[in-house]
Amino acid sequence: MPELSRTAYADLFGPTTGDRVRLADTDLFVEIEEDRSGGPGRSGDEAVFGGGKVLRESMGQGRTTRAQGAPDTVITGALIIDHWGIVKADIGIRDGRITGIGKAGNPDTMDGVHPDLVIGPETEIVAGNGKIVTAGGIDTHVHFIAPGAVDEALASGVTTLIGGGTGPAEGSKATTVTPGAWHLAWMFAALESSPVNIGFLGKGSTMSKESMRDQLRAGVLGFKIHEDWGATPAVISACLDVCEESGVQLAVHSDTLNEAGFVGDTFDAVAGRTLHAFHVEGAGGGHAPDMITAVSLPNMLPASTNPTRPHTVNTVEEHLDMLMVCHHLNPAVPEDLAFAESRIRPSTIAAEDILHDMGAISIMSSDAQAMGRIGEVILRTWQTAHVMKRRRGFLPGDTRADNLRARRYVAKYTINPAVAQGIEHEVGSVETGKLADLVLWDPRFFGAKPQLVIKGGQIAYAQMGDANASIPTPQPVLPRPMYGALGTAPATNSVNFVSEQAVEDGLPERLGLGRAFVPIRSTRGRTKADMRQNDALPRVEVAADSFAVTIDGELVEPAPVTELPLAQRYFLF
């Protein structure tokens, strides 16, 4: 029987089991662990679309109708990178959800076709052969300041935005809070036509539990406590009381100035309850200089914001100006300048790199337009992974490729933020039953520029050439909105995540909007152990005088890098 070389097979059908794929211009490689769509011993029946190819009537395409269960769309032969593994498979989508991961085709002519991946005449095909698929990104730290941030997020592969704001008001420029029923109602309406899932954080900086309960009924999915509104131990404890009774999450930006207490006082106020610790390194805010010690506690779900990722020769300098703008400070006021300088510490930024690689910091987010870049969550995650690969070599368990590291880092912006906010039953991974929020990448552009962004089964964003050209590819090829981002389509492909109390109180009926309101699942009792691939609890200590950081007794030596992948090679500006 004639055989194909691995090179020829990869050219025709994409890489298969045992092949390695380089991720863009990084030093990271992934090795395919399993090929569910074909590969060695199963070649010959791969689902491939095109002239003279397999997916034609009575060949790879059968007669199964949509009413009989055929999927609406099949992504063929894609390399899935997810927290659970690195596998190649066909992916079926039906009614906006993932229905099958395996082998697609026509069981009348092919062996091993997954029963939920039977291709019929009503099935669309997306060619994933030679491409990578990841789950849509989830950003849990979004300031809703400029509407254009939604486009930037989508163009980068982020499909779920959680945070707060009402536009460029001072409160929103500094804090991720949408305060009160009136603001929440019109912000839900404003984002109705945006093809992203939305979740708003309410103001937890209050001793009024009744106000917090009102905000829950008005549609918040959780609360945010921020030092600019007040982050005292009493406020934290009161808000967590409401979180415990309602099941929602509390995200905290703690007291940088240590005015109302030190980091230990905040930990005492939390009292072992689950908490989502924002920008835990501290440059984005939080007890100076030792907020980073929160990574040692099992009840803390720690996150980074992306401007400190990874530590480069430019990181410290750019942060001072960012701080002045974001927190309404005046560089001519000595106290304001001291406030800013206390937050920017090379030692803790350097430690943040290592803690990510150890799996001790579980989540990556943006802090969009408030000391963070919404379009760089994914990019900076993989830049950090690259820097750590160069510095620390393979992770234990990795030898020929970086599968464990890839699974660890992809989890930071997909499944782990979903778990932290109680939405992992709907989004956060490439698994059956979940919303088909999927990102298709050319491996050469992985982490930088998605080829397609699929939102609830609909193509919402894509790299697309001149619309007046004779084919889709002539320059300028740019990330552009597609039909899934137009008209009323976003109301069918995206959801609003809210508290269960909001749904029970009739919020969807009161607002009368088109998209579904989906209640979160309880976040209470969740711990670091629930953070996929990122559950490490090292002992971290920070010297009060020098800010020197030790991790499990080992001193961290700052080594800012001068060059990164996924940078000027991919972007003019």
Curated annotation (Swiss-Prot):
Name of the protein: Urease subunit alpha 1
Active site as annotated: H327
Assembly behavior: May form a heterohexamer of 3 UreC (alpha) and 3 UreAB (gamma/beta) subunits. May also form a heterotrimer of UreA (gamma), UreB (beta) and UreC (alpha) subunits. Three heterotrimers associate to form the active enzyme.
UniProt-listed Enzyme Commission number(s): 3.5.1.5
Gene name linked to the record: ureC1
Residues where Ni(2+) 1 binds: H141, H143, K224, D367
Taxonomic path: Bacteria, Bacillati, Actinomycetota, Actinomycetes, Kitasatosporales
Places the protein is found: Cytoplasm
Annotated substrate binding sites: H226
Keyword Hydrolase assigned: yes
One Pfam family named in its UniProt record: Amidohydro_1
Cofactor note: Binds 2 nickel ions per subunit.
GO MF terms, alphabetically ordered: nickel cation binding; urease activity
Cofactors that this protein relies on: Ni cation
SUPFAM superfamilies noted in UniProt: Composite domain of metallo-dependent hydrolases, Metallo-dependent hydrolases
Keyword Coiled coil annotated: no
Similarity comment: Belongs to the metallo-dependent hydrolases superfamily. Urease alpha subunit family.
Keywords associated with the record: Cytoplasm, Hydrolase, Metal-binding, Nickel
Pathway named in the protein's UniProt entry: Nitrogen metabolism; urea degradation; CO(2) and NH(3) from urea (urease route): step 1/1
